[in-house]
Structure formats: structure tokens, C-alpha cells
């Protein structure tokens, strides 16, 4: 790592930022009990914004859901990508 990149910082890729955010959300859910998943609409909106940079999609093309069974939580993301 050069001194300039250390001082100025390196720009993280959007995939790395999204991964960090999802890990924080999941960790928060585990520690804080089981509050309602009120962050799902915001997560869906942000996913649409990121994916729209590469593929033309709308809000209707993505579905985000959180299912809970006993001690297992599953965050499911379904994205319909139009054929080119």
C-alpha cells in the first residue's frame, strides 16, 4: 500500500459495501432479538439502485423477503433480469 492510498483512502467497490451492510444488518438482528424487518423496503430500493447501474430493472423486478424458522433466518433476494 502506498502512502497516498493510505492517506487518501481507497474507494471500496459497491459489492464490498453491500456485503458489509448486509453483515451488519444480520449481526444486529442476531444481537437485538427479533425485531420486525423494517429495513427490507430500504434494502430493496438500494439494491435496485445498484443493479440499475448495470442492467435496466424496476422495483417490480426485485423481491426481498426474510423468513424465520426456529433459530434460522433466511434473507432471500429474487431479481428478474430482462433478456438482452
Curated annotation (Swiss-Prot):
SUPFAM superfamilies cross-referenced by the UniProt entry: Cell division protein MinE topological specificity domain (SSF55229)
Pfam families: MinE
GO biological process, one term: cell division
Family annotation (InterPro entries): MinE (IPR005527), MinE_sf (IPR036707)
Domain of life where this protein originates: Bacteria
Alphabetized UniProt keyword annotations: Cell cycle, Cell division
Matching Gene3D superfamilies: Cell division topological specificity factor MinE
Function as written in the Swiss-Prot or TrEMBL entry: Prevents the cell division inhibition by proteins MinC and MinD at internal division sites while permitting inhibition at polar sites. This ensures cell division at the proper site by restricting the formation of a division septum at the midpoint of the long axis of the cell.
Family to which the UniProt record says this protein belongs: Belongs to the MinE family.
Name listed for the protein in its UniProt record: Cell division topological specificity factor
Originating gene: minE
Amino acid at each position: 500500500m502506498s502512502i497516498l492510498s493510505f492517506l487518501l483512502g481507497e474507494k471500496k467497490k459497491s459489492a464490498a459495501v453491500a456485503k458489509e451492510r448486509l453483515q451488519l444488518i444480520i449481526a444486529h438482528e442476531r444481537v437485538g432479538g427479533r425485531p420486525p424487518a423494517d429495513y427490507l423496503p430500504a434494502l430493496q430500493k438500494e439494491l435496485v439502485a445498484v443493479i440499475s447501474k448495470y442492467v435496466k430493472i424496476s422495483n417490480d423486478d426485485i423481491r426481498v423477503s426474510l423468513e424465520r424458522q426456529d433459530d434460522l433466518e433466511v434473507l432471500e433476494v429474487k431479481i428478474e433480469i430482462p433478456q438482452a
